């Protein structure tokens, strides 16, 4: 063993740091296996060489008793050209290049692996998410200055190593922890293990979403970047150095910290509500948590027992002003009730119908009511009279109101010749009605009396109503609304068919010829053709007249 140790010390250092690191690991593993001869059989599964090496490194002493070892320059991890100091000159001469964790480690004696100990591993992919970082609520730490490191490490100047390519990580190490770890006689040692860091990361913090990052976790990240051995170097060497009493004290204090509140500088949101929401938020304090700087979306809920003088005064004034009003309204409620303002929705529908009926009782120019009694018929816009009313009108019963009666028979000539009412005019074409009534409008000789026009056909269902509407439209077109030449127009209900059986004495000849008589089919076709032609011509003339007006 001594010869192999001497040969390894005299071997020249290699330029490749990764190969030197693996060679040293194998050499240390061989030394440990040669020393550990007492354990020949283990009930558990044998450890791999790298795991065995990790267990050996976990029991190594941090202090050499001589010159204290310097902490790595953690601020220059992101710089590829940043130099990393090597071991002391005696280590360099021996040709051994240790890992970043091994710079602080020295063999204290023989090592016998513990059979009950199991290596704690963390997944390589989740290393960044598991490792904690310093929160904003932790005490302020001082960064190790480069000047102090240069003064205390003059003896370590020598061969430099290239820093591996890795993402720069900003770390803040407490000065007290650095002093306690690397001083020859530390007074207070800080015991921080990876397990406790993982537990703290799981608990999290309500203010910062970034997990804290400590020195041990940073070393694990660097080992992972070097050669992928982060899974095997998860145990902190400081846990092995501390005595059982100190570990117990630290574990109890850690339990108190974990069971207590997470933040010692937590600020209640209720206190922030007192801050004015209108205050400018352009200059936010960097130490103020982000969630407390956000604008409040809801109005702050005031306690029920908070009575301001203004509110009390306002309540008293309103209550005092309402009391006399209530006293004044009480007798009015007993005597008379207030009437609601009338709106269109409150009007009774029956009243509206009555008013409409009243307007419908007026003649076309809205100046007088109808002189003859009317009844409802098939066409709601026209006024109907019965045969009895027409017979009374012919007999002169309405002579005091009516000056002259015009009975217009809208049937075809062969129907008119077959039987018609006495004194009726046969006008079955629209042009004939226009020429008779509108070319020279007729007026009553006496203002108190009226001119009445009564239309009818065989049933008063089609031809009579059409002629009545035509005359009203032409009359409206020739006069300014609502003036009319003939404001009073009527329809004989049931037509000649219903009037002839009851009043034959008022018909001449006393007979009845229907429209669809077998003897007058040819004449029926001829008159229908003429009527359609006249209607087409009339529409054409109306269109031409409208174009001329434009």
From Swiss-Prot:
InterPro entries: MPI_Phosphatase (IPR000751), Rhodanese-like_dom (IPR001763), Rhodanese-like_dom_sf (IPR036873). GO terms for biological process: cell division; G2/M transition of mitotic cell cycle; positive regulation of G2/M transition of mitotic cell cycle; positive regulation of G2/MI transition of meiotic cell cycle. It catalyses: O-phospho-L-tyrosyl-[protein] + H2O = L-tyrosyl-[protein] + phosphate. SMART domains: RHOD. The keyword Phosphoprotein does not apply. The keyword Cell cycle applies. The active site is at residue 457. Its EC number is 3.1.3.48. GO terms for cellular component: cytoplasm; nucleus. Tyrosine protein phosphatase which functions as a dosage-dependent inducer of mitotic progression. Directly dephosphorylates CDK1 and stimulates its kinase activity. PANTHER family: M-PHASE INDUCER PHOSPHATASE 3, M-PHASE INDUCER PHOSPHATASE DUAL SPECIFICITY PHOSPHATASE CDC25. Belongs to the MPI phosphatase family. This is M-phase inducer phosphatase 1-B. It comes from Xenopus laevis (African clawed frog).
């Amino acid at each position: 063993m001594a010869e192999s140790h001497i040969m390894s010390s005299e071997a020249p250092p290699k330029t490749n740091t990764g190969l030197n690191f693996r060679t040293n690991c194998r050499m240390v593993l061989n030394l440990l296996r040669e020393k550990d001869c007492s354990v020949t059989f283990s009930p558990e599964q044998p450890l791999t060489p790298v795991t065995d090496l990790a267990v050996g490194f976990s029991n190594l002493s941090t202090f050499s008793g001589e010159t204290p070892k310097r902490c790595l320059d953690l601020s220059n991890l992101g710089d590829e050209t940043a130099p990393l100091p090597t071991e002391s000159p005696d280590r360099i001469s021996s040709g051994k290049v240790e890992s970043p964790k091994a710079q602080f480690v020295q063999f204290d004696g023989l090592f016998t692996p513990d059979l009950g100990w199991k290596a704690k591993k963390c997944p390589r992919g989740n290393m960044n998410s598991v490792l904690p970082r310093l929160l904003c609520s932790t005490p302020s730490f001082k960064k190790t200055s480069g000047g102090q490191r240069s003064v205390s490490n003059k003896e370590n100047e020598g061969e430099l190593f290239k820093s591996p390519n890795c993402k720069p990580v900003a770390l803040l190490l407490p000065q007290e922890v650095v002093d306690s770890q690397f001083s020859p006689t530390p007074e207070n040692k800080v015991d921080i293990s990876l397990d406790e860091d993982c537990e703290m990361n799981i608990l999290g913090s309500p203010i910062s979403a970034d997990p804290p990052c400590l020195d041990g976790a940073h070393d694990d990240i660097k080992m992972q970047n070097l050669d992928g051995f982060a899974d095997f170097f998860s145990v902190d060497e400081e846990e092995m150095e501390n005595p059982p009493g100190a570990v117990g004290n630290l574990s109890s204090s850690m339990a108190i910290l974990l069971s207590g509140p997470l933040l010692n500088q937590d600020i209640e949101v209720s206190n922030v509500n007192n801050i004015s929401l209108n205050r400018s938020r352009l200059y936010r304090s960097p130490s103020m948590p982000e969630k407390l700087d956000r604008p409040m979306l809801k109005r702050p809920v005031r306690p029920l027992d908070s009575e301001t003088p203004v509110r009390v005064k306002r309540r008293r004034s309103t209550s005092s002003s309402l009391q006399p009003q209530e006293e004044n309204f009480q007798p009015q409620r007993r005597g008379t009730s207030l009437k609601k303002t009338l709106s269109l929705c409150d009007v009774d529908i029956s009243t509206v119908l009555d008013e409409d009926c009243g307007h419908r009782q007026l003649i076309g120019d809205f100046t007088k009511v109808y002189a003859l009694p009317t009844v409802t018929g098939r066409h709601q816009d026209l006024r109907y009279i019965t045969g009895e009313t027409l017979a009374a009108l012919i007999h002169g019963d309405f002579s005091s109101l009516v000056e002259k009666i015009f009975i217009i028979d809208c049937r075809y000539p062969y129907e008119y010749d077959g039987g018609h009412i006495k004194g009726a005019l046969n006008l079955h074409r629209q042009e004939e009605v226009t020429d008779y009534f509108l070319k020279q409008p007729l007026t009553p000789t006496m203002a108190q009396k009226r001119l009445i026009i009564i239309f009818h056909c065989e049933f008063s269902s089609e031809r009579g109503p059409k002629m009545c509407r035509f005359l009203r439209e032409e009359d409206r077109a020739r006069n300014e609304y609502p003036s009319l030449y003939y404001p009073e127009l009527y329809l004989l209900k049931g037509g000649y068919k219903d009037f002839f059986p009851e009043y034959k004495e008022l018909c001449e000849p006393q007979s009845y010829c229907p429209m669809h008589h077998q003897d007058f089919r040819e004449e029926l076709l001829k008159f229908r053709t003429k009527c359609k032609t006249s209607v087409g011509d009339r529409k054409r003339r109306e269109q031409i007249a409208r174009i001329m007006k434009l």
